[in-house]
Amino acid sequence: MTVTIALPSKGRMKDESSAIFERAGMRITAVGNDRSYRGRVEGVEDVEITFLSASEIAREIGSGAVDFGVTGEDLVREGLADADARVEFAARLGFGHADVVVAVPEIWYDVDTMADLGDVAADFRARHGRRLAIATKYWRLTQQFFSGSHGIQLYRIVESLGATEGAPASGSADIIVDITSTGSTLKANHLKILSDGVILRSEACLVRARKAEHGGNPLIDRILAAVRSAL
C-alpha cells in the first residue's frame, strides 16, 4: 500500500515538521515547484506527501483519507467526537504548544474556578433574563468540559468567527473559550484564565488514522519508529 502523510503547508509548523522528518532520515522535497501541494520522501518508495492547512489535516485524518498527519491536538479533538477511537496520537512533537482555556473578565473578582463559574451560570438567567454566553471556536471541547466534566448546563455557545478575545468587550458574549500560547492577548483584553480552566494542553502531534490495513505493515512501523527516534 502507498502511505500518505499530510504535513502543514506553510509557516513554522511546516518548517518544524520537515526538520523532524529530516532528522528521522526522511528528507521531504516538493514534487514540481516549491509551491506544490505534493511532495515525496527522498529514497523511500510508496510514501506520498500532501501539504494541507492544519485544520484540513485534522479533517483528513479523521476521515481516513490520509494515513498520517502533523497537526495540533486541539484541532483533532475538536473535530472528532471519538478521537481516540479513530486516531492514534503517535508522537508529541514538541512544538506548536498552546492551551485551550476558559477566560472570564478580570472584573469578575469572585470568579476564579469552574465551580465559581457554575454558580454564576446558575444565577445568570434570573439576573439577566438569558443564559451565560460563551464565545468560542471550540464548541465540542467546550461542551465536554462544561457539561461533561463540571456539570454546568446553563449556558449557550456563541460561534466566534473573528477575534474571540474581543467578544466580552463588544458585548457579544460574557466569557470565552479560546487557545493561547502566552496569555498576553487575553491580558490585553482584560481577561483572566480560571485556575482550573485549562481544557487542553495542545501541541503539534504525529497522528495516525486507525486503519485495519496498518496492522503488521512494516512501512507504517518504520515511519513511527523513525519519527519517535528523532524526538
Curated annotation (Swiss-Prot):
Keywords: Amino-acid biosynthesis, ATP-binding, Cytoplasm, Glycosyltransferase, Histidine biosynthesis, Nucleotide-binding, Transferase. Disulfide bonds: none annotated. It catalyses: 1-(5-phospho-beta-D-ribosyl)-ATP + diphosphate = 5-phospho-alpha-D-ribose 1-diphosphate + ATP. One of its GO terms (biological process) is L-histidine biosynthetic process. Its EC number is 2.4.2.17. It is an enzyme of class 2 (transferase). One of its GO terms (molecular function) is ATP phosphoribosyltransferase activity. Pathway: Amino-acid biosynthesis; L-histidine biosynthesis; L-histidine from 5-phospho-alpha-D-ribose 1-diphosphate: step 1/9. GO terms for cellular component: cytoplasm. It holds the Pfam family HisG. NCBIfam families: hisG (TIGR00070). Heteromultimer composed of HisG and HisZ subunits. Lacks the C-terminal regulatory region which is replaced by HisZ. Catalyzes the condensation of ATP and 5-phosphoribose 1-diphosphate to form N'-(5'-phosphoribosyl)-ATP (PR-ATP). Has a crucial role in the pathway because the rate of histidine biosynthesis seems to be controlled primarily by regulation of HisG enzymatic activity. PANTHER family: ATP PHOSPHORIBOSYLTRANSFERASE (PTHR21403:SF8), ATP PHOSPHORIBOSYLTRANSFERASE ATP-PRTASE (PTHR21403). Belongs to the ATP phosphoribosyltransferase family. Short subfamily. This is ATP phosphoribosyltransferase. It comes from Sinorhizobium medicae (strain WSM419) (Ensifer medicae). The lineage of its organism: Bacteria, Pseudomonadati, Pseudomonadota, Alphaproteobacteria, Hyphomicrobiales.
